[in-house]
Amino acid sequence: MRGNMITFRMNGLEVSAEEGWTILEAAKFYGLEIPTLCYYEGLSPYGGCRLCVVEIGEGEKAKLVSSCTYPVEPGMAVRTDTKRVIAARKMMIELMVSVAPGSKVLQDLASQFGVTEVRFEPRHEECILCGRCVRICAEQMDAKAIGFQ
């Protein structure tokens, strides 16, 4: 149900986006970078990596949501770079690095966000659990030949 324009605030600025857009789509439209791993244009939103978390709401009612799955709403307040958001992203990077410490993508993200130590025991997997390959196989190849264990 796209078409109608919705006005809301993103990082203190009043912005508009089409009804049906996600927060991530609106952020990309306005040139705001939000990190993602599981998001892939053309695939259904998944929200599995949680790197794209943003904070919505004000004060005590503020909460973290996945920007790739959360639709824009009239009058909502979105913040993409609060201390809480950055801390959540760092934690997710730390968890993912513990799963696949050899991943160049994760090493780059860890460097970008200043994650220098991992408190969790490494598993040394190849898969970073972003879900992209599973969704591409299911949605674009119509095969459903692979999945998570």
Regions found by a protein language model. Name each.
Residues M5-I6, G31, V115-T116:
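Generic signal for short, ordered secondary-structure residues
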Residues R2-L13:
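Eukaryote-biased recognition of intrinsically disordered, low-complexity regulatory segments
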Residues R50, V54-Q149:
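Fe-S ferredoxin-like electron-transfer domains
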Residues G12-P74, A87-A88:
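N-terminal cofactor/phosphate-binding cores enriched in small/glycine residues
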